[in-house]
């Protein structure tokens, strides 16, 4: 096992032969990525971290197994939050242009924030789309920012204002709600 691959936790009951009954949760980070495998009762069986862009046979083996459920949280750099009433997918090329990106190198994905009636648009490089596409449907990828905003919006019921600071891999994300409305992310 390489020093770029870390097994954080492994349960004695974990076996790859039962993978079709398991859930695979992946955090696709900027420098490091992490996967966790849970059983039918949501008990953690395996927690594994690896440095991105390093070919690790064990990671490839685990990614290629069939799972009951797969969820991928993508640590995106580019994000646009657009009210649902203004969003139309026919304008995707313009959204990419706003981010100074092109279709040749990036793919625009969207995630609906139902609680706030907002579309969260985020980009994934085509290189990462191709890598992840070997194992999963691109529709299984969700923006970390969208999940964070959606979760926080459910926590503000009785608060007039709410500030969240999320630290990750040397960066910080600030999310601010006032009067139950998203003000800043």
Where are these regions (language model features)?
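Hydrophobic/aromatic-enriched cytosolic interaction surfaces used to assemble or bind macromolecules
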Residues: 1-185
